[in-house]
UniProtKB/Swiss-Prot annotation:
<dbReference type="GO" id="GO:0060320">
    <property type="term" value="P:rejection of self pollen"/>
</dbReference>
<keyword id="KW-0713">Self-incompatibility</keyword>
<keyword id="KW-0964">Secreted</keyword>
<dbReference type="InterPro" id="IPR010264">
    <property type="entry name" value="Self-incomp_S1"/>
</dbReference>
<dbReference type="Pfam" id="PF05938">
    <property type="entry name" value="Self-incomp_S1"/>
</dbReference>
<protein>
    <recommendedName>
        <fullName>S-protein homolog 21</fullName>
    </recommendedName>
</protein>
<comment type="similarity">
    <text>Belongs to the plant self-incompatibility (S1) protein family.</text>
</comment>
<feature type="signal peptide">
    <location>
        <begin position="1"/>
        <end position="21"/>
    </location>
</feature>
<keyword id="KW-0732">Signal</keyword>
<dbReference type="GO" id="GO:0005576">
    <property type="term" value="C:extracellular region"/>
</dbReference>
């Protein structure tokens, strides 16, 4: 009986992890001034996943999707570097789950522009979030 209870508990956890929450998406777009021909260097990662370094030309987009973990502690950070010399940069928290029962399925959109970094969630209007260092 004890083994059956443990087995059912483990199967239940596996089922929850498969259906729990929806996939969220992080998108980063290079909207820098085309006259300057700046390439945007992007490096996103979490505690457990390194998405890798991407180089985005003007107008290009990178995106990736993920599920928030069961504990609601999922967090992704992105470092954005403004070309051509990549001396101007900014680190952002691109996504942060809030709470034990965090489940989302939203799209987190980051836009790199000459005057700073802009953000919008899903189809809401974008707004100025932070400046380049």
């Amino acid at each position: 009986m004890k083994n059956l209870s443990i087995f059912l508990f483990v199967v239940g956890l596996c089922m929850i992890s498969d259906v729990y929450g929806k996939k969220s998406t992080i998108t980063v777009k290079n909207e820098l001034n085309p006259k300057n021909k700046n390439i945007l260097k992007v490096h996103c990662k979490s505690k457990n996943n390194d998405i890798g370094v991407k180089y985005l030309k003007i107008g290009e987009v990178m995106s990736f999707s993920f599920k928030t973990n069961f504990w609601g502690t999922t967090e992704f950070w992105c470092n954005l570097y403004k070309g051509p010399d990549y001396k101007r940069y900014r680190g952002i928290t691109a996504y942060q789950a809030i709470g034990l029962f965090a489940k989302d399925g939203s799209s987190y959109n980051w836009l790199a522009r000459d005057d700073g970094i802009y953000f919008h969630k899903d189809s809401l209007p974008s707004y100025y979030k932070t400046y380049w260092l």
